[in-house]
Regions:
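Extracellular adhesion/carbohydrate-binding repeat motifs centered on closely spaced tryptophans
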Residues: 2-176
Length: 176
């Protein structure tokens, strides 16, 4: 009986070892990790960080719902470039995804992302000695525009800076 118990115990131990040896063992690590072709971030508790900003070196990156770095996308009032870095102190032209089929809206909108990475919103910005206005959506305003009760001419969709003095405008093709 003792011999059978020893054999059963040995077989059980061998079976247990075989089952356990197939399980992967992970080293405790946190911070930036490369998984395949993607960079991801694990917090101090070992959880994958999702839907959050994390800094690497001097640059900020946004991690999407899958934990991977988001690239070439506007995220709330910020924008990340094709490497996933938050854009700062830069102009960015983005495709109109708000109402792309409307003939009254442009195909693209211009944004200016300031030093903190946020897009300029409802404010004037001086850039290269020229003044630009950005509306409540962060779009560069163009054409004849009323701002705080005053009327301004802010150029075309491609240049958008405030004009002063006399301006000769092309005839409006929609005028009767």
């Amino acid at each position: 009986m003792k011999k059978q118990t020893k054999i059963a115990a040995a077989l059980s131990a061998a079976a247990f070892m075989m089952m356990v040896s197939g399980l992967p063992v992970y080293a405790a690590s946190y911070g930036w990790v490369t998984e395949g072709d993607a960079k991801v971030y694990y917090d101090e508790d070992g959880y994958l960080t999702t839907d959050a900003w994390r800094k690497r070196g001097e640059d900020w990156f946004y991690l999407g719902e899958d934990g991977q770095i988001v690239k070439s996308k506007k995220i709330d009032e910020y924008y990340v470039d094709d490497e996933g870095k938050m854009v700062t102190n830069a102009w960015v032209e983005l495709k109109n995804e708000e109402d792309p089929d409307s003939p009254e809206t442009p195909d693209t909108f211009w944004y200016y992302f300031e030093k903190d990475g946020k897009s300029a919103v409802s404010k004037w910005v001086k850039f290269d000695s020229k003044w630009y206005y950005f509306d409540e959506s962060g779009h560069m305003a163009t054409g004849k525009t009323e701002i705080d009760g005053a009327t301004y001419y802010l150029g075309t969709e491609k240049d958008g800076f405030m004009r002063t003095g006399w301006i000769r405008l092309e005839e409006n093709s929609h005028a009767p």
